[in-house]
């Protein structure tokens, strides 16, 4: 497995001094680098030792394990929260001290503001002592401001690090658990859900730690402020506080509603992402079946449900944001209305001290406190989901029992087990067998007999209900569907072992990979993507086998590895790899290829989970039991022993000498013809995930907003926002004006000594009330409308992206790993649904506030503009400097996140393999390495934003200091109201300004998600689904296919995989297509289905395929694909997604493929929901479902792509027989590795290196000893070749000379005087 990240820079924080830590100076070199060039992974600092994934995960896991034990003792449910608290409470509690100091400073600040305003109210130009005292107050005010600037960011940095630690530890635990899940537990969860835990749920820890301390700091601060307000304005302060108190339960109600909506949303999101995962995985099949519309409807419906919940929760959020915006105004309004009505006179110092005090407590009470409640309630939901996952059943730990006497053994006795306890019939019943070193145990039986389950029992994946399995020795396992992980081919084969050249070369040779490595562009250094996207099926199977052989285990469990390769390679693998390289091992081989049974030490026949027969090949022949009939029906002739009397290898009939002689002497396809690159799947290499550079363009914003609403509506929204802000400021200005008038009136009163008149209270109060009401209305309206537009935009863009994905050519899915495409649908759409609208609204509100603060300050004290100019310049330069680096850091964070998910989903796909090789530890290390890489990026993301914020707040602090001291210098020309307004406004600027700038950067960062989604909305499209030129209704009547000089490549820059192919396939002809792995067989089908556009012409019944719509073309051909795909949903949906058939037709189709009973046994019959990707059916059964689909479609052209590779001979025969009956009137093309399935075809097409080498009747080709087809048949061994030639001859004469009675001489071959179980097959089409 590849190292994740090569070079590591030491973390400068470890050696930083106190000043450097306070102001984040240690980051300066990084910013310099970011200013000069684009940052890469090598620029990131290594993770601090205490933040390493392994350390954090194991620490928390320890606490969780203790908690589980304690809960068991106390007979209660374990609590994950308890484990988290016990693990982290000390370090987190210390951070509370920061909160305490910071909030105290916030509360004390207004007192000094009041003293300065007081000085202006009692202004006396001769009193120098008062002036000096005022300067003292200004200094203390400035000091408070500086303390806040530094402390706030230190606190935030530390709590976010705490959040990161919990998240990383959780991910480590989730992955560790995923590797240990029992199979019954895997049934209860899906890959999608586990990925969702890792992509969404754990992120809640990052957010909850930030606000948690405010749960106690909020109420404390409120008490402090109340006391100060009481001193300042007496009992009327209670009126204002009453509003605050009313707001709290209102907000917690909103919070509760919000969290219930969130958990519903999460369920819908899970379902959508799960379905999306399957759609992307099965895209090739969906395209060939032309099922896009059905899946589009499915996803659209899921998305509609999800969006309705998201809109609901967004409106609640909108109300919350609005209440934050207007709370202050309402509180001040109520307070001063009460104050005035109680007969008090308004003064500037009262107004602005109260305003600032309320401002201090308002942030905490209306934002941090409710956020804490909301985040805690979200975190509780997430912790519950994670806890439920962590409590799922695990596989019992199996000790790898080393053989005591050095002898490996597999012993199974009376073994009975169920995959699903709900079903009445056990999966395996009463199995008993023993296998010892040097034995090859072959397991055969029809589809669904329990062959793979038998291997899983030996692996320990299927726990026994009764009976016993004892395994001594190390196991290697090769799964039926090959599993490879992202990395090079070599790292897949080594699978964590040391590279030993000699052993490696031997393994490569035994697994027939040598030739492939010469042809692959980078040999075994080729990097294969997710699910081995760049290897053909046969290559993947051989790489898997090579992995097993290289491990040098004692016991080999091989689940039908020979079915994915052609006969010649299969023979090579069997002789060289299974019989020779593994001859001293215990080998249990599940196979459908009966010709190899002769070499087996024992044969085990399974049917319906029970062992029908067990014995050696010769015993079966002697006793003539049922196996004989099974063989008669299905055996493809077993190879006769090379020379009687040659020394045998552990009684396998191939001797070493004969194998080597065969190797060197036989004329082979491999020697004869230079083989082209394995062109089947050498699509273009997996490109790096694109990281767009530089600014987010205006175009992205334009597309985003126009997706949400019409331009007319957007202009209206802008005006609404501006008007709201104007009224917001007017309300404060009116209060200041009122205080000034009142002050002037008092002064006159004092000067004259008699009352000259009072202010008209109703006039001032009336206007004040009006302004407040309008502010509230505008505040709420703009909040809700912004959310409406942005959620709508997310919905529109999701639909466009999904539509674009459905219309993208297959190449796109081969080039991009599932994780990368899914990331857009989960992470990026998640951002657009949830965080972007919230951040955007927040940004607009704070930006407008900042602008109004500066405007008011400048209107009152024009000279403020003088220091503003240099401060603004510094700010602009700083922001640009910061964004150069922060953008790169954010993108690095996104791109280092993908591998974490890819590694998880890849591990889940190869779970059995990983466990069989005991590679959990190694996978866990790799996962931790991926996590650490992501933590490096995340750590930089946190610290760089703090670096910027500290500097911004410093600019604001300078602004406050200038205003405070400046107003004292100009004391003569100012009155108290003006100073109060300017100073109190500039104090609110402190947190507000840096928050608005950070939110602007945040919006820009989140717009990357929008950009990534928009990038997928205009992918290259395949041809249109429907064209104006529609084929006639019953087309094709005949099913004649003409290839006219066809060249085919998967991508413009890729190699040609079909070259100058010209062929005519007549109506109702059955054509077999053969050739080595990678000869271009599957590409021929891709060209026919136009999965990529072919050059040259392909005609079907005189209609040029490139002239009609893709759906018109694809719907008219049926395909039984190589890898059968079922989708989550009902069996009915899987057979007939468009509801075009009646129940009766569906049951009839199922009956014809002998699945009716299996489906009737399900609890909901045809409406039973299938497990993810139909994993509750065996591969063979899934293949039969594909056949049922083809039967239902009743098309004139049927294509079979190695469909019977994974099924037993009986099912194979069933499929062949159904194809003969049902598709007699159709044109059938069959790609086959088993030559017996196509020997009775009308024609055989032999492809090699993308060229059509031979095309004629099988018998005609077999008459020419130089033909490739002849050589292929001869490689099966003399007897088998004779039998096939005989069949071909009969078919030939029956077809061409029907009048001549043709009887075949019995073919009888004896080996050692024993009649071999040789029969002629009436199989295939």
UniProtKB/Swiss-Prot annotation:
<keyword id="KW-0445">Lipid transport</keyword>
<dbReference type="GO" id="GO:0015732">
    <property type="term" value="P:prostaglandin transport"/>
</dbReference>
<feature type="transmembrane region" description="Helical">
    <location>
        <begin position="710"/>
        <end position="730"/>
    </location>
</feature>
<feature type="transmembrane region" description="Helical">
    <location>
        <begin position="136"/>
        <end position="156"/>
    </location>
</feature>
<dbReference type="Pfam" id="PF00664">
    <property type="entry name" value="ABC_membrane"/>
</dbReference>
<feature type="transmembrane region" description="Helical">
    <location>
        <begin position="977"/>
        <end position="997"/>
    </location>
</feature>
<dbReference type="GO" id="GO:1904772">
    <property type="term" value="P:response to tetrachloromethane"/>
</dbReference>
<feature type="transmembrane region" description="Helical">
    <location>
        <begin position="858"/>
        <end position="878"/>
    </location>
</feature>
<feature type="compositionally biased region" description="Polar residues">
    <location>
        <begin position="658"/>
        <end position="667"/>
    </location>
</feature>
<feature type="domain" description="ABC transmembrane type-1 1">
    <location>
        <begin position="93"/>
        <end position="377"/>
    </location>
</feature>
<keyword id="KW-0067">ATP-binding</keyword>
<feature type="transmembrane region" description="Helical">
    <location>
        <begin position="351"/>
        <end position="371"/>
    </location>
</feature>
<dbReference type="GO" id="GO:0048661">
    <property type="term" value="P:positive regulation of smooth muscle cell proliferation"/>
</dbReference>
<comment type="function">
    <text>ATP-dependent transporter of the ATP-binding cassette (ABC) family that actively extrudes physiological compounds and xenobiotics from cells. Transports a range of endogenous molecules that have a key role in cellular communication and signaling, including cyclic nucleotides such as cyclic AMP (cAMP) and cyclic GMP (cGMP), bile acids, steroid conjugates, urate, and prostaglandins. Also mediates the ATP-dependent efflux of glutathione conjugates such as leukotriene C4 (LTC4) and leukotriene B4 (LTB4).</text>
</comment>
<dbReference type="GO" id="GO:0008559">
    <property type="term" value="F:ABC-type xenobiotic transporter activity"/>
</dbReference>
<dbReference type="GO" id="GO:0001409">
    <property type="term" value="F:guanine nucleotide transmembrane transporter activity"/>
</dbReference>
<feature type="transmembrane region" description="Helical">
    <location>
        <begin position="836"/>
        <end position="856"/>
    </location>
</feature>
<keyword id="KW-0547">Nucleotide-binding</keyword>
<feature type="domain" description="ABC transmembrane type-1 2">
    <location>
        <begin position="715"/>
        <end position="1005"/>
    </location>
</feature>
<dbReference type="InterPro" id="IPR011527">
    <property type="entry name" value="ABC1_TM_dom"/>
</dbReference>
<feature type="transmembrane region" description="Helical">
    <location>
        <begin position="954"/>
        <end position="974"/>
    </location>
</feature>
<dbReference type="InterPro" id="IPR036640">
    <property type="entry name" value="ABC1_TM_sf"/>
</dbReference>
<dbReference type="GO" id="GO:0034634">
    <property type="term" value="F:glutathione transmembrane transporter activity"/>
</dbReference>
<keyword id="KW-1003">Cell membrane</keyword>
<dbReference type="InterPro" id="IPR027417">
    <property type="entry name" value="P-loop_NTPase"/>
</dbReference>
<dbReference type="GO" id="GO:0015747">
    <property type="term" value="P:urate transport"/>
</dbReference>
<dbReference type="InterPro" id="IPR047083">
    <property type="entry name" value="ABCC4_TMD2"/>
</dbReference>
<dbReference type="GO" id="GO:0005524">
    <property type="term" value="F:ATP binding"/>
</dbReference>
<dbReference type="GO" id="GO:0060271">
    <property type="term" value="P:cilium assembly"/>
</dbReference>
<dbReference type="GO" id="GO:0042910">
    <property type="term" value="F:xenobiotic transmembrane transporter activity"/>
</dbReference>
<dbReference type="GO" id="GO:0031088">
    <property type="term" value="C:platelet dense granule membrane"/>
</dbReference>
<dbReference type="InterPro" id="IPR030240">
    <property type="entry name" value="ABCC4_TMD1"/>
</dbReference>
<dbReference type="InterPro" id="IPR003439">
    <property type="entry name" value="ABC_transporter-like_ATP-bd"/>
</dbReference>
<feature type="region of interest" description="Disordered">
    <location>
        <begin position="658"/>
        <end position="691"/>
    </location>
</feature>
<feature type="binding site">
    <location>
        <begin position="445"/>
        <end position="452"/>
    </location>
    <ligand>
        <name>ATP</name>
    </ligand>
</feature>
<feature type="domain" description="ABC transporter 1">
    <location>
        <begin position="410"/>
        <end position="633"/>
    </location>
</feature>
<dbReference type="Pfam" id="PF00005">
    <property type="entry name" value="ABC_tran"/>
</dbReference>
<keyword id="KW-0812">Transmembrane</keyword>
<protein>
    <recommendedName>
        <fullName>ATP-binding cassette subfamily C member 4</fullName>
        <ecNumber>7.6.2.-</ecNumber>
        <ecNumber>7.6.2.2</ecNumber>
        <ecNumber>7.6.2.3</ecNumber>
    </recommendedName>
</protein>
<dbReference type="GO" id="GO:0015432">
    <property type="term" value="F:ABC-type bile acid transporter activity"/>
</dbReference>
<dbReference type="InterPro" id="IPR017871">
    <property type="entry name" value="ABC_transporter-like_CS"/>
</dbReference>
<keyword id="KW-0472">Membrane</keyword>
């Amino acid at each position: 497995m590849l190292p994740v990240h090569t070079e590591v820079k030491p973390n400068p924080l470890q050696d930083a001094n106190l000043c450097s830590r306070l102001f984040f100076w240690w980051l300066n070199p990084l910013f310099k680098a970011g200013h000069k060039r684009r940052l890469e992974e090598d620029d990131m600092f290594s993770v601090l030792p205490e933040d390493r994934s392994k350390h954090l995960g194991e620490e928390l896991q320890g606490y969780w394990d203790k908690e589980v034990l304690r809960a068991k003792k106390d007979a209660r449910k374990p609590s994950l929260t308890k484990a988290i608290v016990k693990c982290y409470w000390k370090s987190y509690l210390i951070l509370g001290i920061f909160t305490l100091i910071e909030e105290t400073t916030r509360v004390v600040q207004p007192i000094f503001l009041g003293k300065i305003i007081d000085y202006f109210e009692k202004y006396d130009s001769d009193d120098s002592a008062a002036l000096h005292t005022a300067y003292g107050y200004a200094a203390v005010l400035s000091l408070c401001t500086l303390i806040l600037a530094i402390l706030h960011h230190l606190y935030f940095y530390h709590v976010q690090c705490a959040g990161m630690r919990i998240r990383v530890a959780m991910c480590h635990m989730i992955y560790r658990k995923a590797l240990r899940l029992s199979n019954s537990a895997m049934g209860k969860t899906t890959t999608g859900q586990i990925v969702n835990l890792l992509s969404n749920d754990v992120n809640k820890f990052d957010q909850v730690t930030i606000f948690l301390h405010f749960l106690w700091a909020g109420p404390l601060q409120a008490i402090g402020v109340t006391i100060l307000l009481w001193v300042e304005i007496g009992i009327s302060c209670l009126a204002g506080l009453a509003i605050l108190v009313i707001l709290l339960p209102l907000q917690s109600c909103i919070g509760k509603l919000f969290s219930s909506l969130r958990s519903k949303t999460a369920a819908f999101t899970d379902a959508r992402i799960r379905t999306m995962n399957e759609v992307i995985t099965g895209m090739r099949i969906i395209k060939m079946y032309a099922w896009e519309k059905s899946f589009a409807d499915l996803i659209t419906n899921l998305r509609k449900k999800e969006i309705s919940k998201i809109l609901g929760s967004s409106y609640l959020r909108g109300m919350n944001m609005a209440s934050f915006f207007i709370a202050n105004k309402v509180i001040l309004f109520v307070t001063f209305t009460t104050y005035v009505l109680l007969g008090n006179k308004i003064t500037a110092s009262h107004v602005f001290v109260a305003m600032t005090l309320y401002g201090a407590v308002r942030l905490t009470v209306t934002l941090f406190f409710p956020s804490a409640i909301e985040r805690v309630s979200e975190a509780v939901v997430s912790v519950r989901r994670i806890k439920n996952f962590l409590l799922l059943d695990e596989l019992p730990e199996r000790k790898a029992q080393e053989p005591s006497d050095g002898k490996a053994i597999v012993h199974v006795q009376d073994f009975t087990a169920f995959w699903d306890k709900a079903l009445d019939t056990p999966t395996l019943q009463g199995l008993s067998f023993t296998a010892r070193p040097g034995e090859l145990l072959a397991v055969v039986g029809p589809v669904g007999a329990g062959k793979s389950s038998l291997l899983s029992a030996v692996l320990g994946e299927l726990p026994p209900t009764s009976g016993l399995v004892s395994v001594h020795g190390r196991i290697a396992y090769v799964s039926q569907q090959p599993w490879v992980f992202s990395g090079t081919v070599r790292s897949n084969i080594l699978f964590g072992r040391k590279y030993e050249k000699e052993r490696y070369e031997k393994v490569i040779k035994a697994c027939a990979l040598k030739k492939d490595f010469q042809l692959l562009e980078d040999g075994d250094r080729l990097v294969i993507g997710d699910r081995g996207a760049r290897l053909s099926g046969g290559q993947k199977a051989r790489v898997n086998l090579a992995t097993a052989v290289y491990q040098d285990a004692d016991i080999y469990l091989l689940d039908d590895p020979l079915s994915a390769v052609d006969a010649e390679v299969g023979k090579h693998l069997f002789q060289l790899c299974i019989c020779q390289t593994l001859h001293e091992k215990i080998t249990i081989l599940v196979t459908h290829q009966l010709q190899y049974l002769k070499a087996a030490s024992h044969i085990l026949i399974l049917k319906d989970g029970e062992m029908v027969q067990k014995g050696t090949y010769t015993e079966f022949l002697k006793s003539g039991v049922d196996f004989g009939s099974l063989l008669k029906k299905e055996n493809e002739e077993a190879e006769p022993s090379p020379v009687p009397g040659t020394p045998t290898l552990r009684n396998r009939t191939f001797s070493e000498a004969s194998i080597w002689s065969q190797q060197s002497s036989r004329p082979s396809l491999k020697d004869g013809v230079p083989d082209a690159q394995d062109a089947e799947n050498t699509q273009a290499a997996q490109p790096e995930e694109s990281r767009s550079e530089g600014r987010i363009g205006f175009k992205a914003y334009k597309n985003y907003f126009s997706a949400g609403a019409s331009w007319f509506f957007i202009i209206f929204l802008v005006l609404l926002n501006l008007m709201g802000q104007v009224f917001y400021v007017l309300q404060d200005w009116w209060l200041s004006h009122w205080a000034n008038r009142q002050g002037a009136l008092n002064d006159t009163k004092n000067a004259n000594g008699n009352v000259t008149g009072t202010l008209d209270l109703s006039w001032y109060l009336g206007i004040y009330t009006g302004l407040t009401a309008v502010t509230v209305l505008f505040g709420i309206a703009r909040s809700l409308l912004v959310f409406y537009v942005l959620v709508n935009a997310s919905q529109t863009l999701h639909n466009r992206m999904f539509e674009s994905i459905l219309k993208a050519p297959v190449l796109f899915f081969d080039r991009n790993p599932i994780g990368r495409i899914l990331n857009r649908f989960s992470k990026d759409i998640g951002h657009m649904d949830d965080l972007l609208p919230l951040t955007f609204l927040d940004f607009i509100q704070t930006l407008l506030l900042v602008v109004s603060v500066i405007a008011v300050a400048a209107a009152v004290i024009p000279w403020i503009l003088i220091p503003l100019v240099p401060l603004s310049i510094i700010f602009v330069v700083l922001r640009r400097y910061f964004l150069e680096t922060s953008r790169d850091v954010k993108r690095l964070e996104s791109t280092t996140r993908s591998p974490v998910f890819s590694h998880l989903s890849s591990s889940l796909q190869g779970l059995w393999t990983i466990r069989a090789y005991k590679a959990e530890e190694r996978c866990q290390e790799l996962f931790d390495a991926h996590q650490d890489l992501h933590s490096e990026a995340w750590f930089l993301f946190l610290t760089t934003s703090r670096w910027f914020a500290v500097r911004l707040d410093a600019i604001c602090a300078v602004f406050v200091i200038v205003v405070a001291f400046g107003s004292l210098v100009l004391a003569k020309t100012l009155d108290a109201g003006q100073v109060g307004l300017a100073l109190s406004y500039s104090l609110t600027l402190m947190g507000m300004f840096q928050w608005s700038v950070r939110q602007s950067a945040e919006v820009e960062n989140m717009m990357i998600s929008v950009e990534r989604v928009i990038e997928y909305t205009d992918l290259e499209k395949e041809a249109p689904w429907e064209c104006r030129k529609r084929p006639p209704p019953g087309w094709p009547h005949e099913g004649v296919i003409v290839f006219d000089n066809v060249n085919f490549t998967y991508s413009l820059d890729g190699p040609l995989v079909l070259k100058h192919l010209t062929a005519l396939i007549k109506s109702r002809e059955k054509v077999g297509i053969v050739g080595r792995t990678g000869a271009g067989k599957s590409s021929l089908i891709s060209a026919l289905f136009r999965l990529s556009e072919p050059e040259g012409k392909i005609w079907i019944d005189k209609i040029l395929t490139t002239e009609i719509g893709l759906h018109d073309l694809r719907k008219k051909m049926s395909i039984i694909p190589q890898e059968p795909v079922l989708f989550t949903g009902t069996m009915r949906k899987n057979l007939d997604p468009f509801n075009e058939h009646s129940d009766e037709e569906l049951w009839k189709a199922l009956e014809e493929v002998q699945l009716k009973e299996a489906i009737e046994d399900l609890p909901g019959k045809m409406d039973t929901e299938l497990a993810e990707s139909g994993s509750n059916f065996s591969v063979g059964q899934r293949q039969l479902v594909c056949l049922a689909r083809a039967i239902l479609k009743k098309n004139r052209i049927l294509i079979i792509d190695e469909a019977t590779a994974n099924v037993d001979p009986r099912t194979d025969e069933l499929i062949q027989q159904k194809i003969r009956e049902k598709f007699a009137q159709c044109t059938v093309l069959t790609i086959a590795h088993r030559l017996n399935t196509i020997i009775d075809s009308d024609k055989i097409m032999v492809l090699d290196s993308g060229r059509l080498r031979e095309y004629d009747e099988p018998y005609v080709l077999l008459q020419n000893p130089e033909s490739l087809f002849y050589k292929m048949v001869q490689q099966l061994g003399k007897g088998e070749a004779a039998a096939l030639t005989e069949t071909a001859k009969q078919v030939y004469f029956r077809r061409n000379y029907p009048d001549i009675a043709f009887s075949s001489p019995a073919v009888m071959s004896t080996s050692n005087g024993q009649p071999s179980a040789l029969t002629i097959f009436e199989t295939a089409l």
